[in-house]
């Protein structure tokens, strides 16, 4: 709400937006989200001699795509990703969502898995990750329980995964020595 006084002064209440007072327009040239989507869209499959791996662009896999794409590509696999999230992708996987209480990003992952199964890949990779990479910015680096273990939910509720190699092992990327032995 902008309150204008008799002497011309303006006072804004209810939020911190000073646009009506300063007359400055919003600067959209530094849209971090658009920049990030552009970067992630640049990760294309490189022909791999060892087969093809699918990575769903959902939950923590969205954030970790640069790492996993480089990892599997260096090992000789062609890495394919599911399409960008959309209403259509959500609707495609909606029938396999076991609970309305899951967050919307988790519900979207069902559509991502369905899209990957339709690509006829050698395997789909979506590991359970209790911890994320420790960036040293907080007290801990736990993943949300839904994010950490949702691959288990997908494995048990997506019938299209039957007959599809689905790698959803528990992996610890937070401890490099253990990671090397696990992978």
Regions found by a protein language model. Give the residues of each.
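An N-terminal assembly and electron-transfer interface module characteristic of large anaerobic redox
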Residues: 1-183
């Amino acid at each position: 709400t902008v309150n204008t006084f008799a002497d011309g002064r303006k006072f804004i209440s209810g939020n911190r937006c000073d646009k009506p007072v300063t007359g400055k327009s919003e600067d959209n040239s530094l849209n971090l989200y658009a920049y990030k989507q552009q970067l992630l869209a640049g990760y294309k499959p490189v022909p791999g001699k060892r087969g093809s791996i699918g990575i769903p662009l959902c939950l923590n896999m969205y954030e970790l795509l640069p790492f996993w794409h480089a990892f599997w590509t260096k090992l000789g696999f062609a890495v394919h990703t599911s399409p960008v999230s959309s209403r259509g992708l959500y609707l495609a996987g909606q029938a396999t969502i076991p609970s309305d209480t899951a967050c919307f990003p988790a519900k979207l992952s069902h559509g991502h898995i369905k899209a990957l199964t339709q690509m006829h890949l050698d395997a789909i990779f979506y590991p359970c990750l209790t911890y994320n990479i420790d960036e040293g910015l907080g007290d801990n680096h736990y993943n949300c329980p839904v994010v950490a273990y949702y691959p288990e939910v997908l494995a048990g509720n997506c019938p299209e995964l039957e007959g599809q190699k689905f790698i959803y092992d528990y992996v610890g990327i937070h401890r490099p020595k253990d990671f090397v032995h696990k992978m």
